[in-house]
Amino acid sequence: MLTLNHVTKYYGKNLANDDISFQVDSGQIAILLGPNGAGKSTIIKCIAGLLRFQGDITIGGHGNKTTEAKRLLAYIPETPAVYDMLTVSEHLEFIRRAYRIEDDGYGERLLERFELADKRDKLGRDLSKGMQQKLSICCGLVHRPKLIIFDEPMVGLDPHAIKELKLLFREQKAQGAALLISTHMIDSVEDYWDVTHIMVNGRFAATQYNRPEELKARSLEDLFLSLIHI
């Protein structure tokens, strides 16, 4: 579903991503794990088409900046992406119109799951940051994307929302979506990942699969800590 080939990104003369290649298949959860400043958010913004880069990125076989690719993609950034003067309900209606999809009640069910149903008439500017983040998640999922990218998804969420989000990860995987989750919090990715790419200084320092033989030899936490302290 998602393929990156030799993606490199500079900010001026500063190298942010160095020759990154990987793929995320349908029904797979991939993790980008690394300390702050490792280049995780930069590579995600490249995938989402927000930054220019060298190399090649495709989504469902389409170039990542094409309309076809964008219809398959959901990008939920670390900083909530909401409009101050739209209500919660109007946010979902805006997304439905943008993607030309009918209201089948899925958006309302997402609001119920994330405890926003009673806030449907509140403006975006009147929501707490945690509520804005939950709304951003609902908006990202309402068009049923095939590739879902989360950047630090647990930040600002309450315990109930974190539980629901983890359940949602598993549900989306079971339904065949590809998920890419960026985080620096190793405990937030336990139990549900298929492959983890550890980023250090803009490049992949290691890749570990969620297989008993690999985890028996060395836990993900031990591998991560050994690499970031080099």
Which residues fall in each region the model found?
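Conserved ABC transporter NBD signature motif
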Residues: 55-69
